């Protein structure tokens, strides 16, 4: 979903070449037919395979890294696969980008990386730490993170699932009607990445100020739009690794977050391991702030 949105944004600009790197040849073939544009170049490979990543990175100026295992339940059953793709794969991508002299890299993360309770979130939290650590030690390549909530109607999200259940006549299955989730459109997801691209410094994390919705209200809205307000809804209970609400910024991050209008920027902690000087010098930080989560943000009606 994100890849298509970015390609749509850039395909008619003066960008010389756009490279699509993924392991899914079917989706690449679909994109090739959809855009039918010589500016697009397709590369089959996997972020787990350093050689294939190295091959695609030659002569690249800018890179957006969205490859990930992102299904929470499946990562609970296969946590090492999440480690290999989300953590090791990201390090492979960053190493290739740095060695190839790429100017800017934006890495896509998730709100599930904040206070993680599941394998997917833990792997994404570690991915963010890898980005910050790399960014701390590299001057030539700017590496930053964007942290998302739910992207409306993106592949693998709940809205297409609910619509398919409605149209097939099956009950709509929800886990907890009071569960809240951040919501943003695909266009907003692209805008967040471009904002980070234009304004980021190495190790930065960027977050959009996003509204949230309860699952109950989301389902009722979809039922009304489709024209089936009385369609059955079945509560099946919380799935593996699910939270009642998601958090985009921790209390600690909110203390140092820089308000940039529609976005927050969390600069990297650039201190080194020589802690003695921090006990002997500097000012005591007394600021306190609350975390930014889907229960306390603006609610959609």
Predicted features along the sequence, with ranges:
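Residues in the short beta-alpha loop(s) of Rossmann-like NAD(P)-binding domains
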Residues: 24, 111, 211
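Aromatic pocket-lining residues of Rossmann-like dinucleotide-binding sites
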Residues: 6-11
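Conserved Rossmann-fold cofactor-binding substructure of NAD(P)-dependent oxidoreductases
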Residues: 36, 41-62
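Hydrophobic/small residue at the entry helix of a nucleotide-binding pocket
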Residues: 1-2
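Conserved glycine-rich Rossmann-like NAD(P)H-binding loop of the short-chain dehydrogenase/reductase
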Residues: 14-27
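Strand-loop microenvironment adjacent to phosphate/nucleotide-handling motifs in alpha/beta enzyme folds
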Residues: 93, 99, 128-129, 133-301
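Conserved residues in the N-terminal Rossmann fold of short-chain dehydrogenase/reductase
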Residues: 22, 43-44, 84, 176, ...
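Conserved Rossmann-fold NAD(P)-dependent oxidoreductase catalytic core, especially the SDR/UDP-sugar
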Residues: 65, 69-129, 133, 143
């Amino acid at each position: 979903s994100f890849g298509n949105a970015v390609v749509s944004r850039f395909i008619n600009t003066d960008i010389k070449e756009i490279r699509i790197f993924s392991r899914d040849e079917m989706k690449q073939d679909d994109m090739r037919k959809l855009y039918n544009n010589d500016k697009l170049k397709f590369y089959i490979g996997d972020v787990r395979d350093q050689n294939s990543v190295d091959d695609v990175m030659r002569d690249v100026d800018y890179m957006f890294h969205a490859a990930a295992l992102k299904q929470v339940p499946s990562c609970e059953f296969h946590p090492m696969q999440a480690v290999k793709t989300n953590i090791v794969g990201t390090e492979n991508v960053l190493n290739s980008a740095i060695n190839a002299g790429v100017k800017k890299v934006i890495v896509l993360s998730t709100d599930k990386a904040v206070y993680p309770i599941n394998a997917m979130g833990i792997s994404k939290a570690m991915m963010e730490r890898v980005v910050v650590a790399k960014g701390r030690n590299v001057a030539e390549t700017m590496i930053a993170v964007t942290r998302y909530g739910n992207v409306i109607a993106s592949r693998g999200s709940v809205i297409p699932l609910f619509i398919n259940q409605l149209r097939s006549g099956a009950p709509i299955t929800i886990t907890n009607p009071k569960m809240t989730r951040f919501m943003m459109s695909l266009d907003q997801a692209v805008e967040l990445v471009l904002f980070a691209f234009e304004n980021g410094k190495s190790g930065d994390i960027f977050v959009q100020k996003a509204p949230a919705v309860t699952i109950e209200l989301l389902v009722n809205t979809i039922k009304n739009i489709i024209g089936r307000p009385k369609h059955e809804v079945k509560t099946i209970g919380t799935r593996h690794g699910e939270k009642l609400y998601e958090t985009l910024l921790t209390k600690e991050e909110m203390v140092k977050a820089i308000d940039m209008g529609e976005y927050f920027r969390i600069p990297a902690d650039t201190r080194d391991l020589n802690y003695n000087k921090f006990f002997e010098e500097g000012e005591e930080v007394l600021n306190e702030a609350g975390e930014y989560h889907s229960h306390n943000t603006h609610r959609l009606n």
